[in-house]
Amino acid sequence: VRALPAFTLLLASCGGGAAENEAGPARERGKPVVAPAAALSPVAAPAPTSPLGNTVGCAPDEDRIFSCKVASGKRIAICGTGERDAEYRFGGSTPELVLRGGRWASVPYSGGGEAQIVFANGTTRYIVFSRMVRTNFAAGEPNNPAISDGVIVLDGEKVIGLQLCDDADTVSIDYDLAEAHFPRADELFSWETDRADRRTR
């Protein structure tokens, strides 16, 4: 089991409501979000500014803060490009979306924790996350942690996409590198990442 610690321009369907866990406060759930097929491809995405130009991965002289492949076969990487500077990259053989800047946050949970890094593209936010939450609270039994990495996409506060890493070589968010390259926020950027738990059990 891969432990924490050491986004996929996507608009995929999202899971519906399920029981809350300690990862966040109780809140009402809406109907499952299903994005149109056309939304799965980038539209008017910013031109890549990556120093690599033709690959999504981090260069040897960059800090690999996060990296994984999603079910579509495309990759997400967050690479530290300089002091207090980093990029979010998504694409297949070449970058389709590159975003700079970002902020990060982390919280501890009983039996785990979560880190998030957020990048903005207009009103759309890409929140990369690495989380581990306890799913079994029976005395004397294993915690049965749910471990997930991925990206959740929000338009304002509306969830419009969620996709999980599908890669044995996933590099979860590195807390030390995130601290070195991003300003820290006091709270997580979204509690909706608990949707991932229902897809990994």
Predicted regions and their residues:
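Low-complexity, Pro/Thr/Ser/Glu-rich flexible segments characteristic
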Residues: 19-47
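Short, surface-exposed coil-to-beta transition loops
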Residues: 73, 112-114, 146-148
